[in-house]
Amino acid sequence: MRTANPGTWVTLESMNSQQEFVLRAIEEQDIRYIRLWFTDILGYLKSVAVAPAELEGSFEEGIGFDGSAVEGFSRVSEADTIAQPDPSTFQVMPRLHKEDTITSARMFCDIVMPDGQPSWADPRQVLRRQIKALADEGFHAFIHPEIEFFLVESLATDGKPPVPTDNGGYFDQAVYDRAPRFRQEAITVLEDMGIPVEFSHHENAPGQQEIDLRYADPLTMADNVMSFRYIIKQIAMKNGVQATFMPKPFQDLPVNGMHTHISLFEGDTNAFHDPDDENQLSDTAKGFIAGILTHASAVSYTH
């Protein structure tokens, strides 16, 4: 038998095996809290924590919540919503603060309705549907983001601009070693969580950093980026500063971006490449570019 999650086919045997692994890991590592994560349509991370004794039931029935209280999820008349943990995303959380005296873990959730149908508004389910649509055309994709953010001394609430943590510039190393140490700590934590990193460096603006994640399939990368944002902000807090991914927190400094490299394959063949084309671009690549331009305004709405 197979589950009917859009965008992927997972055997029930495989799902049960993953659940058993999670339950065993929780017992062996004395994990006290499991955080179940999902996002609203604006990309804000949501979380509910469950005790280990409740997790097996959560796998079976999910966690019910009021979807009408989550941005964009449902109307009051459709408030009953269920967060279904995805055991394949299980990861032990790092202890980043001295107050962290217990071990916790996290899993991402798929949001479903009481009848078991995927929520139309859950960003993870929307992505699953698009991955399935791509697969139906014979394609699969890989995503590689370059994520930029500012480290600032504080985010003022009195209308004054934030103060960058350093005066460094592009690829600078000697910025009191504060930025390099921060990036080193962040990369260590990310890789301990199973999120591989390719590059990191100081960006153009004072206090601006960039960390590039290694490519992955779209769903894995979406989960990784949400984990990345959380970890970066927690490490910043630990170091007495704050991190912001706001596109333009400074009027007179460069913006934060997330340059995203997209690879598209048909089997083992690069679907974007045509050696006979003047620019070595296939018709698929040209159509892909046209689609991005057509939908650019909608894509930029949430950033």
Language-model features, listed with the residues they occupy:
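Glycine-rich, acidic/polar active-site loops that bind/position phosphate-bearing ligands
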Residues: R2-Y301
